[in-house]
From Swiss-Prot:
Localization of this protein: Cell membrane; Synapse
Subunit description: Component of the outer core of AMPAR complex. AMPAR complex consists of an inner core made of 4 pore-forming GluA/GRIA proteins (GRIA1, GRIA2, GRIA3 and GRIA4) and 4 major auxiliary subunits arranged in a twofold symmetry. One of the two pairs of distinct binding sites is occupied either by CNIH2, CNIH3 or CACNG2, CACNG3. The other harbors CACNG2, CACNG3, CACNG4, CACNG8 or GSG1L. This inner core of AMPAR complex is complemented by outer core constituents binding directly to the GluA/GRIA proteins at sites distinct from the interaction sites of the inner core constituents.
Originating organism: Rattus norvegicus
Function statement: Promotes neurite outgrowth and especially branching of neuritic processes in primary hippocampal and cortical cells.
GO molecular function, one term: identical protein binding
Up-regulation conditions: Induced by neural activity and by the activity-regulated neurotrophins BDNF and NTF3.
InterPro entries from the UniProt entry: Neuritin_fam (IPR026144)
Cellular-component GO terms for this entry: AMPA glutamate receptor complex; extracellular space; glutamatergic synapse; plasma membrane; postsynaptic endocytic zone; presynapse; side of membrane
Record flagged with keyword Signal: yes
Name of the protein in question: Neuritin
Primary gene name: Nrn1
């Protein structure tokens, strides 16, 4: 069983992880474009999640959302590629640590489970969207 955290704690966790990544990238001093690239990836994820087709069955909804989630990670790695090598490694480490937090209803759980029980997790998507929005707001305040 995973931890049951409300949206405020999830937002805090995401914000701390993103702040840690931003701090590491800023320290490198060579990666000015990475901020725009990362924010573009985050905005694209938000747009995709907000505009995914309605009226699909749960299995198709989950597949669609998970495709957006994987696209976000691919986009982020691409944005970090031109930066210092350590930034990409840092992102991969943060992704792994986030997955290990085992927060019930997270996109890691939703998209990685494959156990057929993920349909009950769809209401958690709204919490995750709010969390991502809060993380973006925190990130932009840097």
């Amino acid at each position: 069983m995973g931890l049951k955290l409300n949206g405020r704690y999830i937002s805090l966790i995401l914000a701390v992880q993103i702040a840690y990544l931003v701090q590491a990238v800023r320290a490198a001093g060579k990666c000015d474009a990475v901020f725009k690239g990362f924010s573009d990836c985050l905005l694209k994820l938000g747009d995709s999640m907000a505009n995914y087709p309605q009226g699909l069955d749960d299995k198709t909804n989950i597949k669609t959302v998970c495709t957006y989630w994987e696209d976000f990670h691919s986009c982020t790695v691409t944005a970090l590629t031109d930066c210092q090598e350590g930034a990409k490694d840092m992102w991969d480490k943060l992704r792994k640590e986030s997955k290990n937090l085992n927060i019930q209803g997270s996109l890691f759980e939703l998209c990685g489970s494959g156990n057929g029980a993920a349909g009950s997790l769809l209401p958690a998507l709204s919490v995750l969207l709010v969390s991502l929005s809060a993380a973006l707001a925190t990130w932009l305040s840097f």
